[in-house]
């Protein structure tokens, strides 16, 4: 039996087990509490949602966990509690929760209107103005992610580090396990199921997906040549070119062509490697530098040139075209909104890349900054929260047509 069939069999068996506990013994006349709205997973591959009459089951394919979500006004909620290596139960809608903000995109909560139920975060460098506002106002507390006793006070703790030992109230949300931008964005439905706001999650994802696909179709229809793109990073004397499917999908959908290097890493202390790296960069029109920077504000074009260690740059058309970029335009200290807002709104990333590849000059970038032009990151602060924190944040729709 292959893994897909096995997963379906396990899910059906689990649903049958829960149905037995929920409906197997009835004392007199009972009222049925039904699940109100539904989410269907369309694109993501690492989670699935199954619905019963008074419960839901979310299966996480990354860590093998099944989350049994029990409606708070159902009989089963008061008499059932699971905390095993494979099954955990939660009473929903969650009354409060915390999040490991080093690995969990809080932007999903903003789109769902759940910020005021967020009561704890593990870092105060989160790239959300409204989360920072609530934290500054004392409505959210900062937590030690290793203090399980402190984390246990919440109905759930959302985190994305699969290497961390989970406690009974931990729910693993791992959009970063997905290979495409839309697959990652669809994890809003995972969060929505814990709060009974599937209809809102569906609405947000549909809006984002339609805008993304429209932009991708426009980019595909361009008749001009596809720019060659080097998506690269530097670490300890070695440059490498990305092979990550997530980035490749963005480049493809924006109308670019990723650099096809013979090998993946180039050591600048090796003359042969340096010469080959030099030659390769002479063939590209766009460079996206994703080198990790603990101080993004001071990462400039000079930093890139110094790391490159190439004296003759006369053939670099990406410099002639002023097309040297980083995706750290929006930051909070050393944290990048690329790992928060960009996850829930990939249409904005795609629109940025289309402008990078086919510049018009009349578009304002959201996530990318131009190193050649000396653009610096924008530091996100609580004063930038200009809306009611209890309201839902609508996705930004990029004009497409």
Predicted region positions:
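N-terminal ligand-binding lobe of clamshell/alpha-beta domains
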Residues: 2-401
């Amino acid at each position: 039996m292959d893994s897909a069939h096995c997963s379906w069999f396990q899910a059906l068996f689990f649903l049958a087990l829960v149905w037995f506990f929920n409906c197997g013994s009835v004392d007199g006349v009972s009222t049925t509490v039904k699940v109100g709205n539904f989410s269907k997973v369309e694109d993501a591959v690492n989670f699935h949602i199954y619905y019963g009459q008074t419960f839901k089951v979310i299966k996480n394919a990354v860590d093998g966990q099944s989350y049994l979500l029990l409606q708070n006004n159902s009989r089963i909620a008061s008499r059932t509690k699971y905390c095993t290596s494979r099954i955990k139960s939660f009473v929903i809608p969650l009354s409060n929760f915390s999040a490991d903000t080093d690995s969990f995109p809080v932007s999903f909560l903003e789109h769902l209107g759940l910020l005021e139920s967020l009561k704890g975060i593990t870092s105060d460098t989160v790239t959300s103005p409204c989360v920072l506002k609530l934290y500054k106002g004392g409505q959210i507390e900062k937590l030690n992610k290793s203090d399980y006793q402190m984390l246990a006070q919440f109905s759930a703790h959302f985190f994305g580090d699969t290497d961390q030992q989970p406690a009974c109230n931990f729910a693993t949300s791992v959009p970063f396990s997905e290979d495409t931008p839309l697959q990652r964005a669809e994890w809003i439905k995972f969060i929505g199921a814990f709060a009974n706001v599937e209809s809102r999650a569906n609405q947000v994802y549909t809006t984002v997906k339609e805008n993304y696909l429209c932009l991708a179709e426009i980019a595909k229809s361009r008749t001009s040549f596809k720019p060659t793109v080097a998506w690269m990073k530097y670490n300890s004397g070695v440059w490498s070119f990305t092979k990550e499917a997530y980035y490749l999908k963005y480049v493809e959908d924006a109308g670019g062509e990723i650099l096809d290097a013979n090998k993946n890493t180039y050591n600048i202390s090796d003359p042969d490697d340096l010469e080959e790296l030099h030659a390769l960069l002479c063939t590209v029109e766009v460079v996206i530098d994703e080198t990790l920077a603990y101080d993004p504000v001071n990462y400039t074009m000079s930093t890139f040139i110094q790391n490159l260690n190439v004296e003759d740059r006369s053939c670099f058309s990406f410099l002639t075209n002023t097309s040297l970029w980083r995706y750290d335009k929006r930051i909070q200290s050393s944290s990048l909104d690329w790992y928060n807002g960009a996850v829930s709104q990939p249409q904005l990333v795609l629109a940025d890349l289309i402008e990078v590849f086919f510049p018009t000059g009349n578009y304002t970038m959201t996530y990318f900054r131009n190193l050649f032009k000396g653009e610096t990151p924008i530091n996100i602060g609580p004063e930038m929260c200009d809306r009611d924190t209890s309201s839902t944040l609508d996705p930004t729709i990029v004009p497409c047509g």
